[in-house]
């Protein structure tokens, strides 16, 4: 008997629009995410949730995992697509489907599970940051696999909102000087990160320049954000390992 192994299938819920730079350089954020978290032989489907595109409810079970991207919108907002996204996440929670929440996605899952989100207490955070990883966490040891769990990890941050109170069912996995909740998990199916494991230096710098040109940021703040990456880089390889092992483990 010939057994044909089913392709693993994942969905990206894109909660932001592609900038002209990202379209020109990468062909869109979808490609940024797939190149970061995807592997050969997998199927990745794009749903522009910001435009109201969602999978049919009956198709949710076909997916092995989901990724919710960052967004310029507030996760505590009441736009139709945000409310719909929360409803879909509630279904995924009930189904125990794996969901990786990034930035806005991290906050959406907090909202869905009864935590509190709002404006960042210490103000917007943009640039490379070192976050402190929780010690002796068995789940993290599993996700890092053959690599020892590091004491800290560098990640690119770009947010003005944050998790103010964790859901009761959540386990805190990382924090920093500027943000109390940098990473958490719920059960084995929700894994959430405030930073952007998919970002690189050029993506960050383009966002900084664009926001600066829109007069939504002071020059001093922009310079400070860029200066964080003068001599350091994010731990992209370790973040990839962590996220892939969660999604596919």
From Swiss-Prot:
It is found in: Cytoplasm, Cytosol. The active site is at 103 (nucleophile), 196, 198. Residues 19-217 form the Glutamine amidotransferase type-1 domain. It catalyses: an S-[(1E)-1-(hydroxyimino)-omega-(methylsulfanyl)alkyl]-L-glutathione + H2O = an S-[(1E)-1-(hydroxyimino)-omega-(methylsulfanyl)alkyl]-L-cysteinylglycine + L-glutamate; (E)-1-(glutathione-S-yl)-2-(1H-indol-3-yl)acetohydroximate + H2O = (E)-1-(glycyl-L-cystein-S-yl)-2-(1H-indol-3-yl)acetohydroximate + L-glutamate; 2-(glutathion-S-yl)-2-(1H-indol-3-yl)acetonitrile + H2O = 2-(glycyl-L-cystein-S-yl)-2-(1H-indol-3-yl)acetonitrile + L-glutamate; (Z)-1-(glutathione-S-yl)-2-phenylacetohydroximate + H2O = (Z)-1-(glycyl-L-cystein-S-yl)-2-phenylacetohydroximate + L-glutamate. Its EC number is 3.4.19.16. Its main location: cytoplasm. GO terms for molecular function: peptidase activity. Pathway: Secondary metabolite biosynthesis. Belongs to the peptidase C26 family. Involved in glucosinolate biosynthesis. Hydrolyzes the gamma-glutamyl peptide bond of several glutathione (GSH) conjugates to produce Cys-Gly conjugates related to glucosinolates. The gamma-Glu-Cys-Gly-GSH conjugates are the sulfur-donating molecule in glucosinolate biosynthesis. Can use the GSH conjugate of the camalexin intermediate IAN (GS-IAN) as substrate. Required for the biosynthesis of camalexin, a pathogen-inducible phytoalexin with antibacterial and antifungal properties. This is Gamma-glutamyl peptidase 3. It comes from Arabidopsis thaliana (Mouse-ear cress). The gene is GGP3.
